[in-house]
Amino acid sequence: MPKFNYKGFRYVEVSCSEPTELKKECLTGYFMHNDVPEVGNVTTSDPIINKIWKATNVSYLSNLFGYPTDCPQREKNGWTGDGHLGIEAGLYNYDALTIYEKWLADHRDEQQPNGVLPDIIPTSGWGYGTENGLDWTSTIALIPWNVYLFYGDSK
């Protein structure tokens, strides 16, 4: 993880206490995400399809920081519904097995004795009683199922 914090952004505003000439070359931005090897590629004769594929992968990577997150610019939480919706696109393109193994360990850590899971994993305690439904906490079944389909890993 970054030493302090990270944010997704499109524009940067710089404020100074006195007039300063600042060129864009003076600023550095980093595209940060978990280091997952690329395993898939799509190239078509349609440049629009190629751009959509690239944008999908950039979106997936920008939301991969220790676990799948919901967005790179605000909450950056492991919303379970968002996580299981993106797993197929992710695994077709990246070897992210260790990311999902770790996230499943987080699931086991957060699961209450009665089986209840929170909507955000990992959580600081929020999301256990929100009743978002099975579509959110179904990650406990959908993530292992997709890991099995892509890797043949039945553990």
Predicted regions and their residues:
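Conserved hydrophobic/aromatic pocket- or pore-lining residues that grip, position, or stack substrates
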Residues: V12, T56, G86, H107, ...
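Helix-terminus loop motifs that line ligand-binding clefts
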Residues: L97-K155
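Carboxylate/His-rich catalytic cores and anion/metal-binding grooves
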Residues: V39, G83-D109
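Generic recognition of stable, solvent-exposed alpha-helical segments in well-folded globular domains
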Residues: K7, L22, P47-A55, G78-L85, ...
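Extended acidic/polar, glycine-enriched regions
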Residues: M1-K51
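Active-site-adjacent substrate/metal-binding segments within catalytic domains
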Residues: I48-K51, A55-D70, G115-V116, G125
